[in-house]
Amino acid sequence: MIQPMASPSNSSTVPVSEFLLICFPNFQSWQHWLSLPLSLLFLLAMGANTTLLITIQLEASLHQPLYYLLSLLSLLDIVLCLTVIPKVLAIFWYDLRSISFPACFLQMFIMNSFLPMESCTFMVMAYDRYVAICHPLRYPSIITNQFVAKASVFIVVRNALLTAPIPILTSLLHYCGENVIENCICANLSVSRLSCDNFTLNRIYQFVAGWTLLGSDLFLIFLSYTFILRAVLRFKAEGAAVKALSTCGSHFILILFFSTILLVVVLTNVARKKVPMDILILLNVLHHLIPPALNPIVYGVRTKEIKQGIQKLLQRGR
């Protein structure tokens, strides 16, 4: 039975030093079974992304701008998975629900900053495909290792700076009563609702920053793929058009899935009273797990050069 840290009688005097995470309150007896698919997805995400990183690092033929961007995406996926899933599994397996005040806000910062970093990486990769298909002769002079280095710095700095105020503002609130978070993770709104203060500023900043970052990235992604589609439809060689549509189509579908599930999570958090709590919690967990599991498959394993790189590494190991 989960007990809050302070009772109503002393909630105004006893500060909160840790939080308790409650996962799927209506399915407590099913948590061990729920952990099985989550564990498999976690192992898939970690294994696939680690394999992709090692392959790109060790195979000299993959030391190219696009694959460096794939490495960045895999690194972001690994950090996101390690930030969220081990704690969720610890709750399921060992009932370790407590999370310290600093750890909670560190998790919040990583989640809030790394998800926009992923969308920004998708945007740069979409631009890479746009240049490769629409301006193939200029591709080597535009998409260089120096370009990727600058883009990577921009991705990290922009999102870290603009999302840092979210956990900072939330941590500055006073927590002096209920300490049970109705979630598996330290989501900003789930934590803010436990504070004794008005957190309107937090909600406004998260909304503006989140939609500014994600909205601008998604707009540029869709714009890039619009130009790509227009260029592909003009291809005279049918085989080239089919190949380009197959590759870029799978990328676009994955990005669409990523943005859709993120939009659903945001909307369900806003309308949380109309959405079953367990559904809301499940969505919060899955949108940190499914994209990291799918990214290396769609962007990596389906790529001929990546397959060849993995085969070479396996042959060396024999």
UniProtKB/Swiss-Prot annotation:
Function as written in the Swiss-Prot or TrEMBL entry: Odorant receptor.
Alphabetical list of PROSITE patterns matching this protein: G_PROTEIN_RECEP_F1_2
Source organism superkingdom: Eukaryota
Keyword Cell membrane: yes
Subcellular location(s) of the protein: Cell membrane
A GO CC term assigned to this protein in UniProt: plasma membrane
Sequence similarity: Belongs to the G-protein coupled receptor 1 family.
Chain positions carrying an annotated carbohydrate: N10, N188, N198
Organism of this sequence: Homo sapiens
InterPro entries: GPCR_Rhodpsn, GPCR_Rhodpsn_7TM, Olfact_rcpt, OR51/52/56-like
One Pfam family here: 7tm_4
Extracellular topology ranges: 1-32, 83-106, 168-203, 266-280
UniProt keywords, alphabetically: Cell membrane, Disulfide bond, G-protein coupled receptor, Glycoprotein, Membrane, Olfaction, Receptor, Sensory transduction, Transducer, Transmembrane, Transmembrane helix
This protein's record includes keyword Disulfide bond: yes
Membrane topology listed for this record: Multi-pass membrane protein
Disulphide connectivity of cysteines: C104-C196
Main location: membrane
Transmembrane annotation, as ranges: 33-53, 62-82, 107-127, 147-167, 204-224, 245-265, 281-301
Single Gene Ontology MF annotation: olfactory receptor activity
Cytoplasmic side: 54-61, 128-146, 225-244, 302-318
Protein name: Olfactory receptor 56A1
Classification lineage: Eukaryota, Metazoa, Chordata, Craniata, Vertebrata
